[in-house]
Amino acid sequence: MELTPREKDKLLLFTAGLVAERRLAKGLKLNYPESVALISCAIMEGAREGKTVAQLMSEGRAVLTAEQVMEGIPEMIKDIQVECTFPDGTKLVSIHDPIV
């Protein structure tokens, strides 16, 4: 199977998101990379499902709460930007202060 560098990046991000999902299900608090991966995956999946950029920007702020991540993580993640493929092309989805 041949994958482009972009496809490899998406696959790696998705895998990290799955790890984060499992750790969260076990009741563990997520660290920085896990938090970013989980939020990014939720955004990419939403785009795949046909949601709008505005919907994803709103939903991206509801993926995690401060109680679900390690201390200091909400302050470290000020913005997350994810390039997603929509039916009408590729767009950049930005989420400001994603963990509240």
Curated annotation (Swiss-Prot):
Subunit structure as annotated in this protein's UniProt entry: Heterotrimer of UreA (gamma), UreB (beta) and UreC (alpha) subunits. Three heterotrimers associate to form the active enzyme.
Functional pathway: Nitrogen metabolism; urea degradation; CO(2) and NH(3) from urea (urease route): step 1/1
Keyword Cytoplasm: yes
Compartments (UniProt record): Cytoplasm
Official protein name in the record: Urease subunit gamma
Pfam families the record matches: Urease_gamma (PF00547)
InterPro entries, per database record: Urease_gamma, Urease_gamma/gamma-beta_su, Urease_gamma_sf, Urease_subunit
Chemical reaction(s) catalysed: urea + 2 H2O + H(+) = hydrogencarbonate + 2 NH4(+)
EC number: 3.5.1.5
GO biological process terms on file: urea catabolic process
Gene name linked to the record: ureA
Main location: cytoplasm
Entry GO CC: cytoplasm
Family listed: Belongs to the urease gamma subunit family.
Highest taxon of the lineage: Bacteria
Keywords: Cytoplasm, Hydrolase
